[in-house]
Regions:
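Bacterial N-terminal signal peptides
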Residues: 4-15
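Mature N-terminal segment immediately following signal peptide/propeptide cleavage
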Residues: 30-55
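N-terminal signal peptide c-region/cleavage motif recognized by signal peptidases
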Residues: 17-19
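Short, surface-exposed, low-complexity cationic segments
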Residues: 51-65
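Peptidyl-prolyl cis-trans isomerase
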Residues: 22-28, 32, 65-229
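A short N-terminal beta->alpha junction/helix N-cap motif
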Residues: 40-41, 61-62, 88
């Protein structure tokens, strides 16, 4: 979940705005033992979960993280879901999941191309909705946990504009719009950066207190290894 895969719903600031997304793991329930890639306290992370997350990343980006990165991602998702479910954080409405699925489908040229891509990466409609629902749940909880305590002042906004945005746009041969028209967008970027930094620190601190065992993944069955970036 590091600044890599939070649901891409925060902000879209041209090519220079950072985007992060992630997906929360559902509450523990009866599972078919298909292979264990990690043990956390009295729970497990399965190979099918790793495969599903990798397939989702391939659907969106054309590639996925490595197996080790996917496992790390799932461990952090477990941490978020464990706390969120303990506090009875509300699940997203079906209509919200519908909207995000429709948005994903709209990135493909037509319905046939979308269905073909789902088949290629190994996802069906039900699995996609499950992953999307987890994404929304996770992103919302992380935002809820950290956003309210983050303050961004005008000096920080001006500094970002002057020392980051303007040089990046100039390097691309583009002229930066006036700061006045970008204040709210830059503020959101800085808030999201702070949320990402605080969540990363939270993951590191929480993992140091958990009993986590990483299982060998060198012998994963054929066809289950996630594709590399």
């Amino acid at each position: 979940m590091r600044a890599a895969y939070l649901l891409a719903a925060w902000i879209s600031l041209a090519a220079w705005a950072p985007a992060v997304r992630a997906s929360a793991r559902p509450a523990p329930q009866a599972q078919i033992l298909d292979g264990i890639v990690a043990r956390i306290e009295n729970d497990i992370i399965t190979l099918s979960e790793l495969r599903e997350l990798g397939a989702y990343q391939q659907l969106l980006d054309g590639h996925s993280q490595s197996d080790g990165e996917l496992r790390s991602e799932l461990i952090e998702q477990w941490i978020v879901n464990n706390e969120a479910s303990t506090t009875r954080f509300p699940s997203p409405a079906e209509a919200e999941v519908d909207r995000e699925v429709i948005r994903i489908q709209s990135t493909f040229p037509n319905a046939a191309a979308y269905q073909q891509r789902l088949t290629t990466v190994g996802l069906n409609a039900e699995a996609l909705r499950r992953v999307v629902g987890r994404q929304i749940y996770l992103a919302r909880y992380v935002d809820y946990k950290f956003r309210s305590s983050i303050q961004v002042d005008d000096a920080a906004i001006a500094d970002y504009y002057r020392n980051h945005l303007v040089p990046e746009l100039q390097a691309k041969g583009q002229q930066a719009p006036p700061l006045e028209g970008l204040t709210d967008q830059i503020r959101e970027v800085l808030v999201e950066q702070a949320v990402s930094n605080r969540s990363s620190a939270w993951f590191d601190e929480t993992k140091s207190r958990l009993k986590i065992t990483l299982e060998p993944m060198d012998g994963l069955p054929s066809g289950t290894r996630a594709s590399q970036p």
